[in-house]
Amino acid sequence: MPSDMLQFPSENDRQTFERLVSELPDLIHKRCHDYDELYGHKLLEEGPAEVAKFYSKDHAHALLFKFLKANAFSYEGAVKQLVSTLNWRREFQPLKAAFAEEHDERLMAAGYISYDASAAPNTRTVTWNLYGKLGACKDLFADQDTFIRYRVGLMERGLQALNLLDPDNCSMTQVHDYKDVSVWNMNADVKKCSRRVIAIFQDHYPELLYAKYFVNVPTILRWVYDVVRAFVSEETSRKFVVLNDGTKLAAYFAGVPAAYGGTAPATLAELPKPASRPSPYALFLLQKHISEELD
């Protein structure tokens, strides 16, 4: 939402936000190697005109607010997480994972992003993760980066469907479907990758999740949910819902396929999708990377 509409629990929290805004340039220059991109948005109103034009105060402030909220408006906590996130993005290059890299088609078949502009608040953008399909590509988990770059890329594409200035579409919903998953196809490599992904999302994507549904989870696999809870904050875990029967998902939000108890198109592939194009600043950075690689 626009900067003047941000809601602070107290005047002290507002002052903490203003401090972070004022000290952000120094933080980025001194502790983040000048890297100022966050989820495709520019955090600083600096640089040549052709770069500075990508800055939006409202978007930058909305993102800073999320980091503060995730840390109970602790300045030190928010700064630590923000600095860590910007340095991770500078090194990992998640925008490239989302828009410039090709991923194994077996992985691509295990994840979908749907978008319904008429859906209830913050259920418009949904990422679907079909873990049962990963049993056919366990070989890909031996190199953890293969799966992690795919999974982060899916997350980043989903973020492009959000509108940080719209309180009804500033967070996403996630569905993790464990149909056809058994203890036999969750080997050590899969578990290690899962833990790394959970840690990445907890550390570097604060306040972007509205709700997460674990569906078709057999009792014998409840440990998966327990592992996830162990890696996330209590605030995040309160957004989790576990459903043994996937057809009950329709009771929580509309627009889901028949397999989940809804009346939408029969398959996830038929659900309406967002454009998922990179933001203007993300596109500029991607083109810059390509140009530098060619040089």
Swiss-Prot record:
Known cofactor(s): heme b
Record-annotated CRAL-TRIO domain positions: 100-268
PROSITE patterns assigned: CRAL_TRIO (PS50191)
InterPro entries cross-referenced by the UniProt entry: CRAL-TRIO_dom (IPR001251), CRAL-TRIO_dom_sf (IPR036865), CRAL/TRIO_N_dom (IPR011074), CRAL/TRIO_N_dom_sf (IPR036273), Sfh5 (IPR042938)
Gene Ontology cellular component annotations, sorted alphabetically: cortical endoplasmic reticulum; cytosol; endoplasmic reticulum membrane; plasma membrane
Highest rank taxon of the organism: Eukaryota
Cell compartments where the protein resides: Cytoplasm; Endoplasmic reticulum membrane; Microsome membrane
Keyword Endoplasmic reticulum attached: yes
One term of GO molecular function: metal ion binding
UniProt keyword annotations, A-Z: Cytoplasm, Endoplasmic reticulum, Heme, Iron, Lipid transport, Membrane, Metal-binding, Microsome, Transport
Catalytic activity: a 1,2-diacyl-sn-glycero-3-phospho-(1D-myo-inositol)(in) = a 1,2-diacyl-sn-glycero-3-phospho-(1D-myo-inositol)(out)
Binding of heme, residues: 131, 151, 176, 178, 212
Entries under SMART domains matching the protein: SEC14
Keyword Transport annotated: yes
One of the protein's GO biological processes: regulation of exocytosis
Membrane topology of the entry: Peripheral membrane protein
Protein family according to the UniProt entry: Belongs to the SFH5 family.
Job description of the protein: Non-classical phosphatidylinositol (PtdIns) transfer protein (PITP), which exhibits PtdIns-binding/transfer activity in the absence of detectable PtdCho-binding/transfer activity. Regulates PtdIns(4,5)P2 homeostasis at the plasma membrane. Heme-binding protein that may play a role in organic oxidant-induced stress responses.
Protein name as catalogued: Phosphatidylinositol transfer protein SFH5
Gene assigned in the entry: SFH5
